[in-house]
Amino acid sequence: MHDIEFIKNNPELFDKAMLSRGLESQAAKIIELDLQKRKLLTELYALREQRNAITKEVTVLKQSGADCSSHVETSKKLAHEISELEERIKRDTGLSYLLCSLPNIPDDAVPFGKSADDNVEVRSYGQKRSFSFEIKPHYVLGEMLNLMDFRRAAFLSGSRFSILSGQLAALERGLASFMLEMHTKEFGYTEVFHPSLVNDLAMFNVGQLPKFTHDSFQTTDAMRLVPTSEVVLTNLVANTNLHRNSLPLRFTAYSQCFRSEAGSAGQDTRGMIRQHQFSKVELVSITDASQSNVELERMLSVAEEVLKRLELPYRVVLLCTGDMGFSASISYDIEVWMPAQNKYREISSCSNCKDFQARRMGAKCFYLEKQNKRSSFVHTLNGSALALGRTIAAIMENYQNSDGTITIPDALRKFMSADYIRPGTALP
């Protein structure tokens, strides 16, 4: 959600920001709609004053026994006009919808660009392994090991689903435990277990609605399956006014995520890279405005630490204006090396949304200044640490052996009680 006063005071700056996001100039239209709304509000206040004055006159006339029928009729007429005007204002002349449909303003540090091709590499980590045998993609390895079944998943649920069994199922569980233990015990995040169904308001608050209505799965009673734990963890502070000294707040959750993947037909149709259902460990931070840039770098380092301990090569890229998410003001992607594809693939995205989400959900913080309470919107940040399906795929491809087994990274062995992933028994 955008600050209308900022737009009115900085129309050229706002238009430049929207143009960098690939949109047309919007400031003039927003200012005109705001002016229309203010005119309607002025009319409404005037009608209410008239009605209040007549109501007082009616009271006096009744007390004196005088005829007040004409005043009563006028009052009824005004009440009807007020009701109609309130309804017009509620419809808002399209102002609120427009403000809610426009993406966040990019931070000054964000490079201009139209697509992922314009993202800027910040750093890379780790040595890419050299293989003395033909590299197999993770989905081939999984089926060879009898531990990954796409055929049965398709029979049950359709395309873009998978079934893991045996040691791969244990790897999923072990990865979640490894990540959560690290985030909570070493980096101070509070673990949260939450519902997988949320209402439209929760989705709106984080910017998933109204723009991305078709990207989520909706139930028959108008609930939605969570596309990411960000929805729930960020909404934990909706409609609050927190003391600034209580910040930052840091939450983490392991959950199933559900996405329709609208617009991705033909992309990554095999394997675990792009699925309708996947699991993820999410990080969310709530800060004040002065802390959010530092918190973003901290969050990014936490996500990187997962990959460092798994000894997976990766790189960090700063997203350009044309590739950032709707609610983000600045985003870093972490891309893990996938040997079978011979390229890096996104495994995490860490974003600072600044006050964009907080304005939508009414999340503020306050401090006392000479006994006066000063409030401002909080800043919200979110990041994946990490997407488990892609982490499993990366481990399988980077740690594969010539005999088809997978070496388990040292950091995971205490969670797996094994050194290798070996062939299992096929499902019936």
UniProtKB/Swiss-Prot annotation:
<protein>
    <recommendedName>
        <fullName>Serine--tRNA ligase</fullName>
        <ecNumber>6.1.1.11</ecNumber>
    </recommendedName>
</protein>
<comment type="pathway">
    <text>Aminoacyl-tRNA biosynthesis; selenocysteinyl-tRNA(Sec) biosynthesis; L-seryl-tRNA(Sec) from L-serine and tRNA(Sec): step 1/1.</text>
</comment>
<feature type="binding site">
    <location>
        <begin position="259"/>
        <end position="261"/>
    </location>
    <ligand>
        <name>ATP</name>
    </ligand>
</feature>
<feature type="binding site">
    <location>
        <begin position="346"/>
        <end position="349"/>
    </location>
    <ligand>
        <name>ATP</name>
    </ligand>
</feature>
<dbReference type="InterPro" id="IPR002314">
    <property type="entry name" value="aa-tRNA-synt_IIb"/>
</dbReference>
<dbReference type="InterPro" id="IPR045864">
    <property type="entry name" value="aa-tRNA-synth_II/BPL/LPL"/>
</dbReference>
<keyword id="KW-0547">Nucleotide-binding</keyword>
<dbReference type="GO" id="GO:0016260">
    <property type="term" value="P:selenocysteine biosynthetic process"/>
</dbReference>
<keyword id="KW-0067">ATP-binding</keyword>
<dbReference type="InterPro" id="IPR006195">
    <property type="entry name" value="aa-tRNA-synth_II"/>
</dbReference>
<comment type="function">
    <text>Catalyzes the attachment of serine to tRNA(Ser). Is also able to aminoacylate tRNA(Sec) with serine, to form the misacylated tRNA L-seryl-tRNA(Sec), which will be further converted into selenocysteinyl-tRNA(Sec).</text>
</comment>
<dbReference type="Pfam" id="PF00587">
    <property type="entry name" value="tRNA-synt_2b"/>
</dbReference>
<dbReference type="GO" id="GO:0005524">
    <property type="term" value="F:ATP binding"/>
</dbReference>
<keyword id="KW-0963">Cytoplasm</keyword>
<keyword id="KW-0030">Aminoacyl-tRNA synthetase</keyword>
<dbReference type="InterPro" id="IPR015866">
    <property type="entry name" value="Ser-tRNA-synth_1_N"/>
</dbReference>
<feature type="binding site">
    <location>
        <position position="384"/>
    </location>
    <ligand>
        <name>L-serine</name>
    </ligand>
</feature>
<dbReference type="GO" id="GO:0006434">
    <property type="term" value="P:seryl-tRNA aminoacylation"/>
</dbReference>
<comment type="similarity">
    <text>Belongs to the class-II aminoacyl-tRNA synthetase family. Type-1 seryl-tRNA synthetase subfamily.</text>
</comment>
<dbReference type="GO" id="GO:0004828">
    <property type="term" value="F:serine-tRNA ligase activity"/>
</dbReference>
<dbReference type="InterPro" id="IPR002317">
    <property type="entry name" value="Ser-tRNA-ligase_type_1"/>
</dbReference>
<feature type="binding site">
    <location>
        <position position="282"/>
    </location>
    <ligand>
        <name>L-serine</name>
    </ligand>
</feature>
<dbReference type="InterPro" id="IPR010978">
    <property type="entry name" value="tRNA-bd_arm"/>
</dbReference>
<comment type="subunit">
    <text>Homodimer. The tRNA molecule binds across the dimer.</text>
</comment>
<feature type="binding site">
    <location>
        <begin position="228"/>
        <end position="230"/>
    </location>
    <ligand>
        <name>L-serine</name>
    </ligand>
</feature>
<dbReference type="InterPro" id="IPR033729">
    <property type="entry name" value="SerRS_core"/>
</dbReference>
<dbReference type="GO" id="GO:0005737">
    <property type="term" value="C:cytoplasm"/>
</dbReference>
<dbReference type="Pfam" id="PF02403">
    <property type="entry name" value="Seryl_tRNA_N"/>
</dbReference>
<keyword id="KW-0436">Ligase</keyword>
<keyword id="KW-0648">Protein biosynthesis</keyword>
<dbReference type="InterPro" id="IPR042103">
    <property type="entry name" value="SerRS_1_N_sf"/>
</dbReference>
